[in-house]
Amino acid sequence: ANLIALGGARQSAFERLGHDPAADGVNRSVRVYASEECHHTIQRSGGVLGIGRHAIKLIACDSKGRMRVDCLQNAIAEDKVAGVLPMAIVANAGTTNTGAIDPLLAMGEIATENSIWFHVDGAYGLPGILDEKISHLFHGLELADSVIVDPHKWLGSSVGVAATFVRDRQCLYRAFTQEPA
């Protein structure tokens, strides 16, 4: 599910520059910002999508395992100066190891201000939004360009079931559709 969402992020980032990465490949260095606590599929997706695993910049977390927004802002600024294209910001909505939920609202606002795709990895923790005691922790989810959830982890579906939700389905279509041979 993260792979699909980040494929949309890649398409969106390059289309803003007038380039179609699905058709013509990646033509410059990009960056995906994810916390030190991100799931390994984020790095794996970098390799599969042709941007490289090293395009994933791991951002420091606070003592509760949440991404430090100040470090995110610094990383984006440094990459812009270096000519690296910010492609996506990945927020955790409940990490697998600790259940930490990143500051979604602050991260989403940074993404919006910088025209960066905002992806929320809710594979493990997103069903927590249904609990009134913690639903406030998910404020900012509405800013996401993509969100994933794995219903088999909390919601009783079959193992391996995952869902990817995107704001712009046509972007996803362009990222993964190919013409007949």
Regions found by a protein language model. Give the residues of each.
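FAD-binding core of FAD-dependent oxidoreductases
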Residues: A1, H119-G128, W154-L155
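PLP-dependent aspartate aminotransferase-fold enzymes
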Residues: A1-L85
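Short acidic, glycine/serine/threonine-rich loops at helix termini
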Residues: I4-G7, R44-G47, G99-P103, G128-I134, ...
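A glycine- and small-aliphatic-rich helix-loop capping segment at beta-alpha/alpha-beta transitions
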Residues: G8-E15, V48-G50, L105-I110, E132-L141
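Active-site-proximal loop/turn and secondary-structure-junction residues that shape catalytic pockets
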Residues: C38, G94-T95, Y124-L126, K153
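Active-site phosphate-binding strand-loop segment of PLP-dependent enzymes
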Residues: M67-H119
